[in-house]
């Protein structure tokens, strides 16, 4: 058992799907429903990113357990006619190697996507390309968002597909998916940790809704099933799913009246949210929810089409059939720009995490005389280092990778059979939650060097130094306040390209209550702005399949420059030193050396240096 923190789910029984059996069972459902194909996602009814295997139909039908990726399951007749396996899996560049490793090519065809196409675009294009063999296609209305469905319908219009909504968990039942049940309490975090009361959050929400719709008070309803929306608005936490401090449920707000609906699976959770008396908790009883909502004379319904499932929207339409629906969720923007109280909690959390990571990477580098260490040991070591600093949960399964495994961008196997090998790259990507429930995240790489005569190979020094240069470029550049996330990505990525390398993922993701947060993003073409007081990663990487990979990830606060209000700068809140055995000083310019000298000096002061810096 790797994760032994307070809110881990390590005690749950493992779920190891038999892909042969699940595919046979779903094939029978398709035949009975006269469907040629069905979409299979890795989302739950809350459109959650990280799902446990037991609630992930995509894993059950393919064997692939990465956090992102969807698929199309074909009936036996359709698969035979097309000459392909029954499951077509679509994955982005982070998971090409992992999908190859985990999937049986006789049962799963892997569609490897590049940077310029999304999973949902690729699935739609595949359906159109094979439309002559497809007539009726199903989708799980509880596991697909409104925006995903709308784009899918629009992009496949030319194929004239007959779409069938499956809203009663038909796929889950057919493949005997265990699902997810949690009974953990939903509790408040103090206002001192968030900087805003629940009443202030709801006032801000209603102000933005009124500005968007122009409707009088009480005529606009808002709802969301995004668990970090709930946690933000209600100053609440629950740790209801692995690697997330938030809690499950659907939230409905009309003016000052708020309903927290707990559907099957979380309906037994105790709720102790006492600071907002107008909160109504409704458990499992859909009729009771409809009775609560029906008296409101709602003319507008606002929600994020990207983050609300189709079945929930269909239920809302039954309550307010004449209301106009708007794709508007202001909570994402409200969450992105953090209060000073929240930023203080982030700084504290990253100070603790930085100390844990530096301690663990020193251990990973030098080892212990005469002791064999494995990837599993490394994952355990960072878990225990976090625990020693009062962490309560991991923010994602720690990526502890040795040698060639470090070339898997999201490798999570952490094998007890893979030894940390002398002279190989060792990568650790990890994060933790502390009492306030805000996520941390950081990646560092070291050269395993238990003997003084071990030296880095030229290719190892090259990719490490180039990735470091790219990261520094993102950290120190002053950007105009009008810049977009795509501009930051392009600048960082170009450093790698100038040296003949690139990486198949974005440069940065928002960080908040969840380790991946919307509202800000550094990725090719990203149109999110550089939101002041947002927290976001800067994490270029270089991956050489079969050899090894490097990713250097720091987390920054976007700050408006007081002296130049039209300029933003980045405050790095990670202080974990670098491995100077892997840095080619000849590749560094004077500015990069000066930056690293100051950074390593700070790490020395805080006790978070990993190796001795020759510049000091």
Show where each model-derived region lies:
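Active-site neighborhoods and metal-handling regions in enzymes and metal-associated proteins
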Residues: 1-616
């Amino acid at each position: 058992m790797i994760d032994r923190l307070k809110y881990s789910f390590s005690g749950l029984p493992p779920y190891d799907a038999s892909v042969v059996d699940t595919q046979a069972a779903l094939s029978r459902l398709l035949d009975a429903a006269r469907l040629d194909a069905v979409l299979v996602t890795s989302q739950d009814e809350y459109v959650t990113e990280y799902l446990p295997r037991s609630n992930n139909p995509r894993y059950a039908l393919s064997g692939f357990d990465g956090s992102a990726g969807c698929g199309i399951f074909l009936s036996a007749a359709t698969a035979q006619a097309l000459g392909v396996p029954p499951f077509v899996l679509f994955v982005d560049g982070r998971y090409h190697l992992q999908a190859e490793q985990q999937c049986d090519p006789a049962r799963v065809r892997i569609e490897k996507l590049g940077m310029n196409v999304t999973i949902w675009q690729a699935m739609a294009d595949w359906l159109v390309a094979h439309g002559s063999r497809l007539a009726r296609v199903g989708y799980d209305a509880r596991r697909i968002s409104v925006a995903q469905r709308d784009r899918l319908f629009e992009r496949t219009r030319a194929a004239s597909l007959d779409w069938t909504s499956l809203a009663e968990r038909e796929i889950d039942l057919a493949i005997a998916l265990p699902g997810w049940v949690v009974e953990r309490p939903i509790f408040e975090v103090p206002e001192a940790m968030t900087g805003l009361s629940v009443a202030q959050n709801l006032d801000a929400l209603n102000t933005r809704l009124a500005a968007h719709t122009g409707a009088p008070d009480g005529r606009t309803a808002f709802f969301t099933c995004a668990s970090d929306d709930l946690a933000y608005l209600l100053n609440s936490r629950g740790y209801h799913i692995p690697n997330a401090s938030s809690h499950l449920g659907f939230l409905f707000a009309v003016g000052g009246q708020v309903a927290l609906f707990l559907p099957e699976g979380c309906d037994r959770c105790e709720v102790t949210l006492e600071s907002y008396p107008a909160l109504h908790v409704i458990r499992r009883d859909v009729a009771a929810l409809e009775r609560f909502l029906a008296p409101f004379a709602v003319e507008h319904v606002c929600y994020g089409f990207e983050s609300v499932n189709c079945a929930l929207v269909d239920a809302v339409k039954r309550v307010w059939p004449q209301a106009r629906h708007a794709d508007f969720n202001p909570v994402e923007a409200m969450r992105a720009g953090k209060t000073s109280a929240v930023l203080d909690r982030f700084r504290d959390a990253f100070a603790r995490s930085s100390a844990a990571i530096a301690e663990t990477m020193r251990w990973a580098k030098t080892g212990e005389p005469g002791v064999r260490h494995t990837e599993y040991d490394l994952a355990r070591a960072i878990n225990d280092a976090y625990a020693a600093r009062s962490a309560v949960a991991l923010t994602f399964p720690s990526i502890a990778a040795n040698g060639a495994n470090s070339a898997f961008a999201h490798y999570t196997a952490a094998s007890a059979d893979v030894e940390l090998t002398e002279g190989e790259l060792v990568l650790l990507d990890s994060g933790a939650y502390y009492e306030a429930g805000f996520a941390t995240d950081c990646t560092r790489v070291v050269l395993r060097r238990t003997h003084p005569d071990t030296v880095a190979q030229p290719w190892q020094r090259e990719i490490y130094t180039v990735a470091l240069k790219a990261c520094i470029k993102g950290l120190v550049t002053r950007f105009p306040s009008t810049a977009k996330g795509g501009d930051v990505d392009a600048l960082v990525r170009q450093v790698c390209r100038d040296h003949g390398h690139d990486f198949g993922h974005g440069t940065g993701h928002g960080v908040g209550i969840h380790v991946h947060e919307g509202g800000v993003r550094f990725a090719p073409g990203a149109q999110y702005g550089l939101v002041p007081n947002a927290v976001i990663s800067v994490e270029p990487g270089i991956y050489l399949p079969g050899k090894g990979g490097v990713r250097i990830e720091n987390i920054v606060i976007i700050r408006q420059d007081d002296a130049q209000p039209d300029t933003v700068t980045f405050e790095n809140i990670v202080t974990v030193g670098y491995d100077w055995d892997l840095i080619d000083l000849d590749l560094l310019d004077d500015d990069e050396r000066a930056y690293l000298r100051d950074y390593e000096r700070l790490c020395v002061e805080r006790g978070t240096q990993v190796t001795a810096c020759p510049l000091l």
